[in-house]
Amino acid sequence: MSRFNLTGIGMTSQRTRDRLVQRLQDQGITDPEVLQAMASVPRHIFIDEALAHRAYEDSSLPIGNGQTISQPFTVALMTQTLCNRPRARVLEVGTGSGYQTAVLASHPHVGRIYSVERLAPLVTRAEERLRAMKVHVRLRHADGYLGWPEEGPFDGILVTAAPRQVPPALLEQLAEGGRLVVPVGTDNGQVLKIYDRTADGLEVTSIDQVKFVPLVKGLR
């Protein structure tokens, strides 16, 4: 039996999640499948119990190891941006808490998910929580800058930390017709960008100003 309360009570109840979804709609999230995923995924199990009462605030929260769980609006925006069409094979760079992974897995446009994380303790924690939710993904302790070349190419790639420049390996692993969603920049400013792979090359679109932890090379 899982040690996680997936249903939640009080500040982690379904009613509280539904209020969050209403706020996301007010902020411009329109994909009903994304809104349903945000309503159904129990964000409170992906953060420390001491912060569970803040799980459904629209804010980022610390998850240890110098990392954060992204604010729900950002998770919803990135999911909506990636899932504009079916994506049979999706690579997530930066598993983190596993929350974004779970939201992706809840979207019907997403097929098989491969997720890499450079911090071993986060891989272990995310794996435990995703298993409790019966979410089936392939996790790997690996350097996100390198992607997952053995499993590419991917129809969708979503990066949950900000590189100064997009790693070439990720562009190489993007299939024709595929979409890469990635925040790019430094602590002084980041922009959420879309890279669409077409028969003629890459089309790049800037979406919004964002704030992510930096994408770091190497393993820990």
Residue ranges and their predicted role:
Residues 83-203:
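Conserved nucleotide-cofactor-binding alpha/beta core module
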Residues 1-91, 99-102, 107, 122-133, ...:
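Class I SAM-dependent transferase core
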